[in-house]
Swiss-Prot record:
The keyword Metal-binding does not apply. The keyword Glycoprotein applies. Pfam families: IL5. InterPro entries: 4_helix_cytokine-like_core, IL-5. Homodimeric cytokine expressed predominantly by T-lymphocytes and NK cells that plays an important role in the survival, differentiation, and chemotaxis of eosinophils. Also acts on activated and resting B-cells to induce immunoglobulin production, growth, and differentiation. Mechanistically, exerts its biological effects through a receptor composed of IL5RA subunit and the cytokine receptor common subunit beta/CSF2RB. This is Interleukin-5. Glycans are attached at N45, N74, N88. It comes from Sigmodon hispidus. GO terms for molecular function: cytokine activity; growth factor activity; interleukin-5 receptor binding. One of its GO terms (cellular component) is extracellular space.
Length: 132
C-alpha cells in the first residue's frame, strides 16, 4: 500500500513536471489545431454574442479576447476534447499574465529608456498593423 502511494506521488510529480515544461509555442500550435477541429461545436449556438475587437493589433486587445473566451466557455457543453481546448486557452492566458507582470517599471538612465523606446517603436513598425 505504501509503495502504491509512493508510485502515485511519483507519477503525479512526473505529469506536473511534463505539463510545466511544455513550450508555449507548442501549446499555441496545439490550441490552433483544436480550435479548428472544434469550430463547428463552438459555433453551434449562434444566438451567443461575443465581443470582437475592432482593432487589428491583437496584443492591445488581450482583455477583450479573454472576456469573449470566458463567455464562450460558459456557453459551451463541457467535457471531452473541447475541455482540453479551454485548458490550453487558460494556460495561454496565465502565460500572458505572467509576461505582463514583467512590465513593472524600474528607474533607469535616459539612454536605457531611449534604447527601450527605440526597440518598442521598431516592433510597432514591423509587427503591428497600422491603420490609416
Amino acid at each position: 500500500m505504501r509503495m502504491l502511494l509512493h508510485l502515485s506521488i511519483l507519477t503525479l510529480a512526473c505529469v506536473w513536471t511534463f505539463a510545466v515544461e511544455i513550450p508555449m509555442h507548442t501549446v499555441v500550435k496545439e490550441t490552433l489545431i483544436q480550435l479548428s477541429t472544434h469550430r463547428a461545436l463552438l459555433t453551434s449556438n449562434e444566438t451567443v454574442r461575443l465581443p470582437v475587437p475592432t482593432h487589428k493589433n491583437h496584443q492591445l486587445c488581450i482583455g477583450e479576447i479573454f472576456r469573449g473566451l470566458d463567455i464562450l466557455k460558459n456557453q459551451t457543453v463541457r467535457g471531452g476534447t473541447v475541455e482540453t481546448l479551454f485548458q490550453n486557452l487558460s494556460l495561454i492566458k496565465k502565460y500572458i499574465d505572467r509576461q505582463k507582470e514583467k512590465c513593472g517599471e524600474e528607474r533607469r538612465r535616459t539612454r536605457q529608456f531611449l534604447d527601450y523606446l527605440q526597440e518598442f517603436l521598431g516592433v510597432m513598425g514591423t509587427e503591428w498593423t497600422m491603420e490609416h
